[in-house]
UniProtKB/Swiss-Prot annotation:
Active site: 18
Membership in a protein family: Belongs to the phospholipase A2 family. Group I subfamily. D49 sub-subfamily.
Keyword Disulfide bond: yes
Tissue-specificity statement: Expressed by the venom gland.
Name the record gives this protein: Phospholipase A2
GO BP annotations, alphabetical order: arachidonate secretion; lipid catabolic process; phospholipid metabolic process
Cofactor: Ca(2+)
Length: 34
């Protein structure tokens, strides 16, 4: 599903760009989306 793949990339990028643990809670690790 292309939309899911797009979201996966977005969430991964979100986690990479947020250093604060509290902010990271809003991002899901890539592996949980498979």
């Amino acid at each position: 599903n292309l939309i899911q793949f797009s979201n996966m990339i977005q969430l991964d990028r979100c986690c990479e760009t947020h250093d604060n643990e509290a902010e990271k809670k809003g991002c899901y690790p890539k592996l949980t989306l498979y």
